[in-house]
Amino acid sequence: MPTLEIAQKKLEFIKKAEEYYNALCTNIQLSGDKLKVISVTSVNPGEGKTTTSVNIARSFARAGYKTLLIDGDTRNSVMSGFFKSREKITGLTEFLSGTADLSHGLCDTNIENLFVVQSGTVSPNPTALLQSKNFNDMIETLRKYFDYIIVDTAPIGIVIDAAIITQKCDASILVTATGEVNKRDVQKAKQQLEQTGKLFLGVVFNKLDISVDKYGVYGFYGNYGKK
C-alpha cells in the first residue's frame, strides 16, 4: 500500500487548530451514532473546506478511529498540497472509470489510523463518474472497513458534484469563510444539501474572529440563519 506523508508546513498549521477540530468531531459524534460517511463542501473555492476535511479526518484518526479521507473534488483538487508521495498513485477517477482497482489508490499515511484516496486525474465528465454505480458500490464497501469516511467535495455553489456525493453519505457539513460569502448564497447551499435527504450537520465558520463569543471557537452549530 502506498504511503503519503502530510507536508510539514501543513502539519504545523493543523496542530495550532487541533483543539477546535477535536471539539468539532465531538459535535459530529453527538449528532448520531450512525453517521459514518460525511461530505464536506463550501459555496466557493478557497473557503477552507479541504483544510477542514483533513483536520476532521486527522482528529478522528488520532482519537483511535480508523478513518478514510476521500478527495472527491475531482475537478480542482488541492489536497495534493497536504499529502506528498514519492511514487505515482492512482486515485478516485481511475477507479470510477474502471481503469484501476481501488486497492491501488488506497493510501496509508504517516498518521496512525488515517488513510487517503486521492482524486486522481481530471476526468472529462466527473459528474457522470460520481453518478455511477461504481461510486455507490465503493462507498458501501468502504463502510465495512472504516469507522469514519470524510469526503472532500467540489464547492456546491459552483457545481452539482457535492449534492451527488452527499446523497451517498450519511450527513454533510458546509464550510464558509466568514465575511467573504453572501449570506444568501450560504443559505442556498444549505438548502441544496438538505434537499439531498441526508442530515445537514451545520455550518463551519472558517477564518473567524474567535473574539466573537456567540459563534464559539469555530462557529459550528452557531446562530447562523437566525438573524
Swiss-Prot record:
<dbReference type="Pfam" id="PF13614">
    <property type="entry name" value="AAA_31"/>
</dbReference>
<dbReference type="GO" id="GO:0005886">
    <property type="term" value="C:plasma membrane"/>
</dbReference>
<keyword id="KW-0418">Kinase</keyword>
<keyword id="KW-0547">Nucleotide-binding</keyword>
<keyword id="KW-0963">Cytoplasm</keyword>
<protein>
    <recommendedName>
        <fullName>Tyrosine-protein kinase CpsD</fullName>
        <ecNumber>2.7.10.2</ecNumber>
    </recommendedName>
</protein>
<dbReference type="GO" id="GO:0045227">
    <property type="term" value="P:capsule polysaccharide biosynthetic process"/>
</dbReference>
<dbReference type="InterPro" id="IPR027417">
    <property type="entry name" value="P-loop_NTPase"/>
</dbReference>
<dbReference type="InterPro" id="IPR025669">
    <property type="entry name" value="AAA_dom"/>
</dbReference>
<keyword id="KW-0067">ATP-binding</keyword>
<keyword id="KW-0829">Tyrosine-protein kinase</keyword>
<comment type="function">
    <text>Involved in the regulation of capsular polysaccharide biosynthesis. Autophosphorylation of CpsD attenuates its activity and reduces the level of encapsulation. May be part of a complex that directs the coordinated polymerization and export to the cell surface of the capsular polysaccharide.</text>
</comment>
<keyword id="KW-0597">Phosphoprotein</keyword>
<dbReference type="GO" id="GO:0005737">
    <property type="term" value="C:cytoplasm"/>
</dbReference>
<comment type="similarity">
    <text>Belongs to the CpsD/CapB family.</text>
</comment>
<dbReference type="GO" id="GO:0005524">
    <property type="term" value="F:ATP binding"/>
</dbReference>
<keyword id="KW-0270">Exopolysaccharide synthesis</keyword>
<dbReference type="InterPro" id="IPR005702">
    <property type="entry name" value="Wzc-like_C"/>
</dbReference>
<keyword id="KW-0972">Capsule biogenesis/degradation</keyword>
<comment type="pathway">
    <text>Capsule biogenesis; capsule polysaccharide biosynthesis.</text>
</comment>
<dbReference type="GO" id="GO:0004715">
    <property type="term" value="F:non-membrane spanning protein tyrosine kinase activity"/>
</dbReference>
<keyword id="KW-0808">Transferase</keyword>
<dbReference type="InterPro" id="IPR050445">
    <property type="entry name" value="Bact_polysacc_biosynth/exp"/>
</dbReference>
